[in-house]
Design a protein with these regions (language model features):
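PP2C/PPM-type serine/threonine phosphatase catalytic domain
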Residues: 1-173
Length: 173
């Protein structure tokens, strides 16, 4: 049964000169993959990191037999392959600050959804317009929140709000 996917993309440049966000959607054989990657602005070639990661994950999805036998395993594999491709990109470019990106990925199949993320790109689970759950950032301020050192309303203004502890292309991802 075909999967009908309705999605909207809103991407704001903010105070930067370029937008390093990338969105990719693929569907076929009753499954769909939705990917959002955000190239890290302080790093060289963040947009290329996001493009590379999206391309690798879409190619893997298109080549995989559907329905996917192990959806969570597929997400793990897709993120791992994207990470390896972005690390290889950084090696080829030979720049001091390697290309990096954060990622949110969602797989829909048989009326079920599985998701994963790396960094501070989030997945929100909505029901009737209300947020039921969201992924927790791999960031310093998220850790402070979990420890009870800051409140959620203090996260946005915290001086370390942009410090990501895990990302595609980074060490330890």
């Amino acid at each position: 049964m075909p999967v009908a996917i309705e999605f909207a993309e809103v991407s704001l440049t903010g105070d930067r000169e370029d937008n390093q966000d990338r969105v990719a959607v693929a569907s076929g054989d009753g499954a769909a993959l939705l990917v959002v990657m955000d190239g890290m602005g302080g790093h060289a070639y963040g947009a290329r990191a996001a493009e590379t990661g999206c391309k690798v994950m879409l190619e893997l999805f298109r080549a995989a037999p559907k329905p996917l036998f192990d959806p969570l395993g597929f997400l793990h594999l897709a993120l791992g392959r994207a990470h390896a491709a972005v690390v290889a990109l950084g090696t080829r470019l030979a720049v001091d600050l390697r290309p990096r990106a954060t990622c949110a990925i969602c797989l829909v199949q048989r009326s079920e959804a599985w998701w994963a993320h790396v960094g501070d790109s989030r997945v929100y689970h909505l029901r009737n317009g209300t947020v039921v759950a969201r992924t927790r950032d791999h960031s310093h301020v998220e850790q402070l929140l979990r420890e009870g050192s800051i409140r959620e309303d203090e996260m946005q203004g915290h001086p370390m709000r942009n410090y990501v502890e895990c990302c595609i292309g980074g060490e330890g991802a």
